[in-house]
Amino acid sequence: MGSTSKLQGMITDRISELPHELLSQILSLLPRKYAFRTTILSKRWKKYWASVPELDFVFEELSAVWAINTTLTPPTGMWKNEYLSDHVDLLRFVHGVLSLRDSSDIWRLRLHCYCRAQDVSLVASWIRTAIRHNVVELDLRIKAIYKVNEDGPILELPKCVFLCTTLVDFKVMSNCITYAPPTSGCFPRLKSLDVKVEYPRDDSMEKLFSCCPVLQVLSITGIVSDVVSQTIALKFKVSAPELKMLKMSLFRDYRKGDGPSYSISINAPKLENIDIKHDSLPMYSFENVHSLVRGSVDLCVHYGSYHNYVSEHAPALLEPFYNVKHLSIAVHYLKEGCLPAFDKLRELKLVIRDCYYWDLLTEFLNKSPNLESLVIEHEDDQVCVDDYEELYFECVLHSEDQWRRPESVPICLTSHLESIMIRGFKGYPHEVKVARYLLDNGRVLKKMTVENEFHKQLKQRKGSKDCELEFV
């Protein structure tokens, strides 16, 4: 017995003497239901849980299930037994860890879990605990679980999150969290906000992004319908005086609303970088946006019947891009006159899809007199092919008429354009015609790179004696 006690004492001493970093690494490798049990081995381990600055509580299956199931709701409306068991284990683990917490600050809380109706108050209490401990980074991924044809649980983000004076970085992805910010004093130190939404249920999208006085980076992604109720249209309002970088990636569920498209208004006087991606074009409005340097626009779904709508609303979207130096744009169709003048544009990436509206390239060349670098990339899109059906192969692929030469050579070709990259071309007649035109008229062109095999048709054509022609 004596030797056994002595051995246990030696083990306890060794555990107590382990460096903090090594303890952290050991615990990170253990399954959570075993990790918390380490508190019985040594006071040092218990103290570790009471003061560890970074807390990661992640249900391992959540990301995979969420990625597979785009509706975020189990198809059967039922839990798998192993998921339910793991979920309960996680609840106990998180509650146990936070119940041991001493007065030390929490630097980061990462909480990725499911949420049933009976879990709402518990999850909210964990968030409030993090706020009380001066959390700096908060990462929430909360997935509601509920039966088909039932209303899911609603978790209102605690008011203390909005008023937290230490929170700098906030990420939230949820199909059940709602946002009701106070009228003043919100997010006094928040610099980065990443919100992933699914079918916002109220007018919170008008409020959440307009109460961040020092916000510099904002990302809004997710799936939306056009309306939040039968009488209220969905609106996103971004008003942030210090915002420098904005990402909007929203996709529309056409099953949930057939009224006018949702709207997005942006007031950001210091905005420098904007990245926009939609499968339908919302109604955009901009105010005090005059500092853009870099922009990206991707309207990624094409329907022929949608062309007039896009052309009608595209000018409002593109108007603040007049000042950019770097632009990437991927659209299926824009009528002539939709583009502003790009007097400061130096680098352009133009993604052409299978509907091949080459007039857009012509207009860009004409409206970008100082363009120095051009990337043209063809991207296959089966939706275009399906929309055109048999006319696609007869009228699009094998016709030189898809490209119309400009009436006069654009200024950028004769004076500034030094680099051209062509990607994804298949060697169709209109593609060869475009490449030949650029090569023939690029008077100051230094390098043209073609990622394709139709090099034999271009080898002997150069408008600039200094141009290096490269095929890869």
Language-model features: where?
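Leucine-rich repeat
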Residues: 2-231, 235-237, 412, ...
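Conserved hydrophobic position(s) of the canonical leucine-rich repeat
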Residues: 52, 106, 135-137, 167, ...
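C-terminal helix/juxtamembrane-tail motif
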Residues: 2-4, 452-472
